[in-house]
Curated annotation (Swiss-Prot):
Biological processes per GO annotation: conidium formation; sporulation resulting in formation of a cellular spore
Biased composition regions of type Basic residues, renumbered to the chain: 330-340
UniProt keyword annotations, A-Z: Conidiation, Differentiation, Sporulation
Region (Disordered): 313-340
Entry protein name: Conidiation-specific protein 13
Source species, domain of life: Eukaryota
Length: 340
């Protein structure tokens, strides 16, 4: 959830225990924010993979999208739009859950996601988009969630996906976020600076910011053109871990995916009107997917950490219990009520 204009807001809050540890405040900061890697022919200018979009009939949604929307008051479930975005480099569609009051149009979301190289993109399952005062986002290490208008911030999409890659590529051998390891802390300690001020929020954020830099290195030009000598050990480490998934190659296709979630009814109004027929993303060879489930002990730690990432993103987007995302701007489908 990196955006320079809300770093102060995020870091002014008390950082919860799980994420309290991070690079020391005394370290230098290479950039004022990684949005500097978006412009001037940067990440924002990457050519998106061609795609087609098909919208689900109103009435049913993936359970993950329903639970996220209802439990957090991000969206009236009747206002959820569900799309399958099928990119030409992957037969498995990316399923997007968009609240009707999201400032990002589905085409914008599809383009931004399509700019992510397929070998990295395949480590993300669902993409969700909700209202918010500012662009902010979080990752649960399997799926990415966006608030506000991130349409001009491709670096945010790279950042959130970097959280997924931190766990499932860099941390694959330990089945955990690599950024929580002593090796990452030791690597950072060898340098005199981190990517930016936001990198000091936690070891996870420090890694994800370098993940963006590694993505830039693989897709735009050498990150060393940015004079990153003060953090060369971090850059070498993350580029070495992620270059194979960030770098685009002709003819690349996806070769993995997360198994799609079950489908649920939006609510009694949809059921009463006969719009709750079973529906699911059109997925070939479902049995070949990877089930995004962790052992109980790891799941509890994972969920606690993700909850903190989520709350940081909410604060940055101006979302709270008194100002839920579901109440922003338009209400969505006329004549329905928020009944669950």
């Amino acid at each position: 959830m990196p955006q320079a204009h809300f770093f102060a807001l995020l870091l002014a809050a008390v950082v919860p225990a799980v994420l309290a540890d991070g690079p020391p405040e005394s370290m230098g900061e290479k950039f004022s924010g990684l949005n500097v890697l978006d412009g001037n022919g940067g990440l924002q200018s990457l050519t998106p993979t061609p795609y087609t979009i098909s919208q689900w009939p109103w009435g049913t949604v993936p359970k993950l999208c329903y639970d996220t929307s209802v439990n957090n008051k991000y969206c009236n479930p009747y206002d959820l739009e569900v799309y399958d975005v099928r990119y030409t480099d992957c037969p498995i569609p990316t399923t997007v859950c968009r609240c009707k009051n999201s400032p990002m149009a589905i085409d914008t979301i599809a383009q931004r996601v399509g700019q992510l190289p397929v070998k990295a993109r395949q480590y993300n399952g669902y993409v969700s988009s909700f209202a918010g005062d500012m662009c902010s986002a979080y990752s649960d290490s399997f799926n990415n969630y966006f608030f506000g208008d991130c349409g001009n911030s491709e670096s945010v999409f790279f950042h959130e996906l970097s959280h997924n890659l931190d766990r499932h590529v860099a941390g694959a051998s330990i089945n955990d976020w690599y950024s929580l390891s002593q090796d990452w802390k030791d690597t950072v300690a060898k340098d005199t600076c981190v990517a930016d001020h936001y990198s000091k929020a936690s070891w996870l954020e420090a890694y994800a910011q370098v993940g963006v830099m590694a993505g830039y290195d693989a897709t735009v030009q050498s990150i060393y053109t940015q004079n990153v000598g003060c953090m060369v050990n971090q850059v070498k480490k993350v580029v070495g871990q992620l270059n194979s998934v960030w770098r685009k190659q002709p003819g690349q296709m996806c070769d993995r995916y997360w198994i799609k979630d079950t489908t649920v009814c939006m609510g009694p109004d949809a059921e009463a009107s006969g719009h709750c027929q079973a529906s699911k993303a059109d997925v070939a060879a479902e049995s070949g997917g990877v089930n995004p489930v962790l052992p109980d002990g790891q799941q509890k730690k994972h969920d606690a950490l993700v909850k903190e990432l989520q709350r940081h993103a909410e604060a940055a987007a101006g979302i709270s219990s008194g100002k839920p995302a579901a109440d922003r701007k338009t209400k969505g489908k006329k004549g329905t009520k928020f009944r669950v």
